[in-house]
């Protein structure tokens, strides 16, 4: 009995490394350090690549003239390339009416279905031209509305690397890989993804990240493996819904 419980916990405790804001202009020095570390530990992260980066904050970083070859090389290693918005420029405010009630500015929220499809199609076209297959998406600042999900589905993307929950789950023909915390945390039970913005890191942050990966290496899994963990049904939906409300209340009490 105890052995069965331990096995169940072990099989259902894992983390997907999700890296945000991967673009031509970024902190390339730290990216190279992360790449070497991933190779050493045989970790296959998911990289959120911005297909047409126009974010003024990101454009301040050094530019790689060989960016798309770098992306293809990462992809050949088995790293998952995910579409992270289109141009990473915010044009609307959500007033916490976005799907996950994060609030703040958004690249997609509030736009018409046709406008959102145009952005998504343009992004996907860029990846096709660069010979990179896209199976997943996550929006800048976690902000979506129902049009975003409909546009993604109509463009053939059903995997969203975002949301609340203890487990990856399927809802209305979409798969959601939960992303709960702003720093690397390994829960004692459950499967989620990280949120890593290495452009804002200092050397100390990288060293802490390295320690975290070495400590939890065996529990870090690839995108393909996490897709096999997607669950559905009322029980899973209820757990994730309850967790969502607990997190929202906790965040509200901090302000």
Name what the model sees in each region.
Residues 1-136, 143-189, 201-255:
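Catalytic alpha-helical scaffold of carbohydrate-active enzymes acting on polysaccharides/glycoconjugates
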């Amino acid at each position: 009995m105890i052995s069965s419980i331990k096995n169940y916990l072990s099989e259902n405790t894992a983390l997907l490394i999700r890296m945000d804001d991967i673009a031509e202009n970024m902190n390339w020095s730290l990216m190279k350090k992360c790449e070497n570390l991933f190779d050493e530990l045989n970790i296959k992260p998911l990289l959120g690549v911005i297909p047409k980066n126009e974010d003024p904050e990101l454009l301040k970083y050094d530019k790689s003239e060989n960016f798309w070859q770098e992306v293809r090389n990462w992809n050949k290693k088995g790293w998952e390339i995910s579409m992270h918005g289109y141009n990473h420029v915010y044009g609307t405010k959500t007033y916490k009416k976005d799907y996950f009630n994060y609030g703040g500015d958004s690249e997609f929220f509030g736009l018409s279905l046709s406008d959102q499809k145009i952005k998504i199609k343009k992004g996907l076209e860029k990846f096709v031209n660069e010979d990179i297959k896209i199976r997943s998406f996550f929006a800048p600042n976690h902000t979506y509305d129902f049009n975003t999900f409909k546009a993604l589905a109509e463009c053939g993307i059903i995997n969203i690397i975002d949301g609340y929950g203890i487990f990856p789950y399927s809802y209305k023909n979409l798969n959601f890989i939960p992303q709960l915390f702003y720093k690397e945390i390994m829960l004692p039970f459950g499967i989620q993804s990280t949120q890593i913005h290495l452009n804002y890191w200092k050397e100390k942050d990288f060293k802490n990240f390295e320690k975290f990966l070495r400590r939890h290496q065996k529990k870090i899994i690839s995108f393909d493996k996490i897709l096999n963990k997607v669950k559905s049904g009322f029980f899973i939906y209820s757990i994730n819904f309850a967790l969502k409300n607990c997190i929202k209340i906790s965040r509200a009490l901090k302000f």
